[in-house]
Amino acid sequence: MHLDINEYLSVPNMINYQGQYCGTDSPGKSSCSLRDFKEYPIQDFDYKFNSWGFRAEDFEQYLGDKVNICLGDSITVNIGGPVEHSWCSQLAEHFDIPTLNLGMSAAGNDAIKLVYSRACDIFDVQNTFVMYSYLHRRLINGEFICDIHEDNENF
């Protein structure tokens, strides 16, 4: 079965979306800066994404089946680490049914809700786990907005 990526879970422009550092995402404004990672161990892993743009095996085999889903932003994708170390992969070890990682880098909560709705249409979702994102990330008129505008037009 062939699925059009735009018809199902994909969110427009997300696969190639490259967000900018914004307010609280900025390394200089985080609780620990880049200098704190000087001794962080280098890990050897590859980023592999399926045909739908998610960091997992292809999902076609699960269409209509009972699954759990994990939703969120780059923390769910586990950017910076092997997929086996993601919270979704760790959680999957406690279930007898597949647990799908539907994390998207730079996703806002409205994009997460959009993916949730589409996932419920094509899978028999049993449990949903969400790592909510920053509130300033928005999907406005089909475009992902990451920056906080001084006039608060994102809100």
In which residue ranges do the predicted regions lie?
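Serine-esterase "nucleophile elbow" of acetyl-processing enzymes
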Residues: K48-D110, L114-R118
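N-terminal secretory targeting modules
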Residues: M1-I69, I122, Q126, M131-F155
